[in-house]
């Protein structure tokens, strides 16, 4: 048996924080007699259980400065030797070197024991049938002295956890604690708010208009133990969203590095997202698979190998960002108002560990879910007479949105801007499922016996409080304002219902005098009272002047 002392200063620092285990050094003084077993504890929350494979057996004692000294190295088993040598030879160790001492010294030279090499070594050990010892996280276990490769048990990796690169630990002497470090992928969802061309957690939109959603994933840096890396977005849409355009509109992009934003494509105030990737982003749509469930409620987007998409392991070492953009408009069954909204939820499936089978679903675990929400509103416009505020039927109105489309009788929008609507017996016209913004109203024809107003007047729906960090924090405030002779009456954010009136004067009534512009209305009648008082006051002054003038003439 080889009596040399073996030193492995890099076996621990590179792969994990090892409390109570430091570099192995040559002894400078007499040491305590070695024992046959040592205690090890795997702490942290990476996984709940681990498999420990012994590579080398050794006599281990504590040295100075918390170092450990290993002597009398030997292969722990034939299976360990047969699994390790091919891996080391393929990694660059001369094929003429086959002894345990040569293998140990090569591993300790020039930091050969990388996380990628340790992962490959673990794969060979797992496939060789080598015997392992099961370890429970947080519980001390007694192992034979020597070098052990600690591998997270894939079956014990739960939601929000991830297996790390294997950890090489020297067991013996004083108790050893190892703490695997792992960062898990993250996922987020946003929806495009067209009024400011920005991705937000909440937005409002017109029913049936294109509505773009963005899924974004962050793959952390340092995942060097993986040969391939695939992620899968799993999206669940509310009943108020139309899934028919998802597959055709889906675009997927990737960028190197875990740090940075997610602006993979341009956005416009027309409510559309571009398709050309921004600088630093690569379109990988052709490498991805989108599958929409038959019921249209869920769909998945599975990427190809992100390591290959980024050009290799060196680029992937810094992590990655993945963005998926798709179109899912609000449909006719959507919720109106803020009481429920129309939520859209996503979570990310990612490989359990470097050893997981990524060909199916079993090798993946998942992140917590994230969501975004879309809202829409209803505006009821009632035609009323100034003589008693009674509803008027038969008014022909042109109602145009901020894209130049006009409302048609069936509730759709005419892109040519030629459609009109006519008020019914209740005097009402309802703009159902509309985005916030300005609507322009014209009156081509007034009801019989009434005078139509000239020109165009606007009614503005405003939704504030949509730009929030989380959907749960969204408390949109809904208001309506209008230009005379339109009048804003009420706004109920919970139901999304807004009320406004259009006031007509009877034919033959002198038009009211305006002094520039149109007075905005919020439903407060005080301004009308003030205006009436002013008119009455002006009339009294005129009468007084006439009386005075008339009296003078009589006197002459």
Feature-to-residue mapping (PLM):
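Solvent-exposed loop/turn and edge beta-strand elements of beta-rich ligand-binding domains
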Residues: 1-556
